[in-house]
Amino acid sequence: MTKTDPAPMAPPPRGEEEEEEEEDEPVPEAPSPTQERRQKPVVHPSAPAPLPKDYAFTFFDPNDPACQEILFDPQTTIPELFAIVRQWVPQVQHKIDVIGNEILRRGCHVNDRDGLTDMTLLHYACKAGAHGVGDPAAAVRLSQQLLALGADVTLRSRWTNMNALHYAAYFDVPDLVRVLLKGARPRVVNSTCSDFNHGSALHIAASSLCLGAAKCLLEHGANPALRNRKGQVPAEVVPDPMDMSLDKAEAALVAKELRTLLEEAVPLSCALPKVTLPNYDNVPGNLMLSALGLRLGDRVLLDGQKTGTLRFCGTTEFASGQWVGVELDEPEGKNDGSVGGVRYFICPPKQGLFASVSKISKAVDAPPSSVTSTPRTPRMDFSRVTGKGRREHKGKKKTPSSPSLGSLQQRDRAKAEVGDQVLVAGQKQGIVRFYGKTDFAPGYWYGIELDQPTGKHDGSVFGVRYFTCPPRHGVFAPASRIQRIGGSTDSPGDSVGAKKVHQVTMTQPKRTFTTVRTPKDIASENSISRLLFCCWFPWMLRAEMQS
């Protein structure tokens, strides 16, 4: 029977694989902490998170005395407590067991759902085990309490079509995987999720490089030979180390270990071919260099950005394939020529960097009166390797780089230059004043001077100045959030009339939004956006209600 969702925005229809659930009853308007627990689950309408009067922060802090007064107040409703749980901040997620217990005390059924995200308390508990933001111990305590009360492990969120085990695998919480599978039916461990190409929890762990969760799933009988909708086994969805950026040596090491683990777990009787990822382990390093017209000791350009001296070429212990080791001119590297206790070459600390062979080209010093242009050199075809985004150092204008494979791909992907007029998040118009790495967040960021005072700063963040603009005219955004709307300009243009939408961008491991879209658009896209929607939309909704 189809469930009627009383929430303002109903989630999309359930997938074919979702288990049948009991029909929900209408939500009581004012549940009491002393009320007896209902016999059937309901869907609670969305509500804003309560905050103390004149509170200095925009999020709820259960450690604050004023917030504790609200948390333990019998008049605080279940929808309001669900709104608190949705806040993706450590202060809230570390207290998931305390908040969850308060929800249960108010007569909440163990399988009740949050009307905004269609998630149950067990879903939230599994999400709260995420390392860095959540607390696995608190998440396990609440999960054990919910399971003892009869929580259904097979229930799925209709936004993501994920059950509790999928969330635990996605956020790499092995302790929760063990708790969930302890008394679950055998088919739960191999239950699939349509948002991950109908892959199992093991597929989800493999694609997210969750080594701990993958090991735990295999220990509990997960099928390593199960194929998803694309015909891939879990080992085949592990990200390829050759596609990773220059400074992802640790992630490459995890990918190699995880892929080996999953390959070896495939039964010998199963006629499955080994995973066919690009592998150049048997190609001598000198042949690779000869194909590039290089030799050890040559000056090289790394990804069209960093210059250094080629010190190593060959196979490594941290990832499959051929890698080059470069001693950089500046201390912008990651090591001293050794990774994981294995030394490949010697250089000063922070000046060693490893990269795939396709990301280097021979560097040629330019004549004083001409523009640098590196001659073309023979290159091997690495069709699966893509170059990193461009980088511009603070305080310096970037000179034209050599037409290497990486730099050509950078130009194709480039969105805007310094001085270009852009549209930020589809709403705010401004001029690019900065592009490069920052101290406040990893990756490459655009610094934009907005036409209107709707920004956050004057070009400086945490005492570090990246560009100069009037107060509240500065804002930073990743490349995915901007759109070039004109050529280079020195003065701001007229602002484009657009409806103002208050937005808070929340960060989770390995996941970002691309543009501002309606909830319907977000729900219809890939699993990453739909999963993060559960955390992001409540913040935007709360900002709208306050305005």
Curated annotation (Swiss-Prot):
Compositionally biased region (Polar residues): 400-409
Main location: membrane
Residues with lipid group (S-palmitoyl cysteine): 534-535
Region annotation GoLD: where it falls in the sequence: 488-547
Keyword annotations: ANK repeat, Cell membrane, Cytoplasm, Golgi apparatus, Lipoprotein, Membrane, Palmitate, Phosphoprotein, Repeat
Membrane topology: Lipid-anchor
Region (Disordered) residue spans: 1-49, 365-413
Pfam families from the UniProt entry: Ank_2, CAP_GLY
Record has Repeat as a keyword: yes
Subcellular location: Cell membrane; Cytoplasm; Golgi apparatus, Golgi stack
Domain CAP-Gly: 314-356, 436-478
Low complexity bias: start-end ranges: 367-377
Modified how: Palmitoylation by ZDHHC17 regulates association with the plasma membrane.
Post-translational modification Phosphoserine, affected residues: 401
TM stretches of this protein: none
Gene Ontology cellular-component terms listed: cell cortex; early endosome membrane; Golgi stack; membrane raft; microtubule plus-end; nucleus; plasma membrane; recycling endosome membrane
GO biological process: cytoplasmic microtubule organization; fat cell differentiation; membrane biogenesis; negative regulation of microtubule polymerization; peptidyl-L-cysteine S-palmitoylation; positive regulation of apoptotic process; positive regulation of D-glucose transmembrane transport; positive regulation of endocytosis
Ranges: ANK repeats: 117-155, 160-189, 197-226
Composition bias type Acidic residues, residue spans: 16-27
SUPFAM superfamilies xref list: Ankyrin repeat (SSF48403), Cap-Gly domain (SSF74924)
Assembly description: Homodimer. Interacts with AKT1 and AKT2; when AKT1 and AKT2 are phosphorylated and activated, affinity is higher for AKT2. Interacts with ZDHHC13 (via ANK repeats). Interacts with ZDHHC17 (via ANK repeats).
Anything else known: The N-terminal half is dispensable for proper Golgi targeting, whereas the GoLD region is required.
Domain notes: Microtubule association is inhibited by the ANK repeats and the Golgi localization region (GoLD).
Described function: Functions as a cytoplasmic linker protein. Involved in TGN-endosome dynamics. May modulate the cellular compartmentalization of AKT kinase family and promote its cell membrane localization, thereby playing a role in glucose transport in adipocytes.
Protein's name according to its UniProt entry: CAP-Gly domain-containing linker protein 3
Species for this entry: Pongo abelii
Gene: CLIP3
